[in-house]
Amino acid sequence: MKAIVLKEIGSPENLILAEVPLPKIKDNEVLVQVKAIAINPVDAFVRRNQAALEMIYALKGDEENIILGWDVAGIVTEVGSAVTKFKTGDEVFGNFNFIGQANAYAEFVAAPEEELVIKPANVSFEAAAGATMAALTAWASLVKFAKVKKDDKIIIYGASGGVGHYAVQIAKHFGAYVIGVASGDNKDFVLGLGADEFFDYKTQKVEDFINDADIVHDAVWVEADVNSTEDTHLARSLKTIKKGGILSSIVVYPDQQFIDKAKAEKNITVQRVNVTPNDSYLKDIENIAELLSAGEIKTHISHLFPLADMAKAHEIIQTKNAVGKIILVP
C-alpha cells in the first residue's frame, strides 16, 4: 500500500510517498481502508521535533517506517477475531492510538475497535475525519472541563482554526454567548459559525474590553511557552475572566504556581486540556458523531489534498493560520 513516511526529523519535504507493507491486525483491531485523513498542528510539531516524536508518536527506535497521523475515516475491510462492534463494510471514523503509533498517513490502517465509531451516513468521510482530534479537543475543553451551559459568556481564541471553529459551534449548541478571537481576515467566517462578537487579535487586546467572561478557551500556540509565566498569552487571558471563572488551555501547560495564583486571586480554575486516552473517549466521539449527523456542527474544509501532497499540507498547518481543517484523500 502507499503511505507517507517520515524519512527524518525536519522540514515537510521529509514526508515521502512510499510503498509499505499492509498492516496486520490484532485480535481486537479492524483493518480500515482510509478514505480521508485529517492533520493537526501537533502533526507538524512531531515531524520537526525529536523529543515530541519520541513522546507523542512513542518512537521505539526499531520501526521499519515512521508514519505519522491519528485522524481517519474509512471503510472496515477486515475484523480481528475478538471484534464484536464492527463488520466488513462498516463506515467508521476516529482519533486512535493517541498518544502512540496510529500510522494514519496511509491507504490502510489497523485500529482498535474501541477507538472507532460508525460514521453517520449523511456525513462525508472528509467531514468525519476532520471532526476527530480537533472536535474532541473542543468538546473536552468546553463540555467535559468547563461544563458549558446556556448563557455562559465564552471567549474562544483561535476561533477560525481547526479546534476553534468546532469550539464556537459546540458552545452555541449549548446556548452560550460566544466571543470569537481570530485574524480580522476571518471575521465573516467566525461570525458565520454563530459567534456573537468578534475581536481581531492583531489590532485589539480582548482584555482591554472584557473582564467578565465565564470561560476562556485559549488555543494560542506559542511553542516557546511550554510552561506559563506572567508574559504569556495565558496570563493575559486571566484578565478577561470574572471571579470563579474557568480558563481552559489547549496548548500552554500552566505551571502549578500559575494555577495556584489564579485560584487565590480570582478563584479561577485553570487546566490544560487534551484528548489523550480516557474513560469517556468513546462516548465523546459518539456525541461528536450525533452533532455532525444533526448538522449542529459542521467541518469547514479549507484545503483538500491527495495523500501524495502531504508536504504541502504540512507547509500550511505549521503556519497555524489554517482556517478550519486540512484533509487528505488517499
Label every PLM stretch briefly.
Residues 11-13, 20-73:
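N-terminal glycine-rich beta->alpha transition that marks the start or flank
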Residues 71-98:
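A glycine-/small-residue-rich N-terminal strand-loop-strand element
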Residues 129-200:
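Mid-domain Rossmann-like dinucleotide-binding core that forms the NAD(H)/NADP(H) cofactor-binding site
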Residues 208-215:
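A short acidic, Gly/Pro-enriched loop at the edge of an enzyme's catalytic core
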Residues 224-296, 330:
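Glycine-rich phosphate-binding loop and adjacent beta-alpha segment
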Residues 280-330:
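C-terminal hydrophobic helical "lid"/dimerization subdomain
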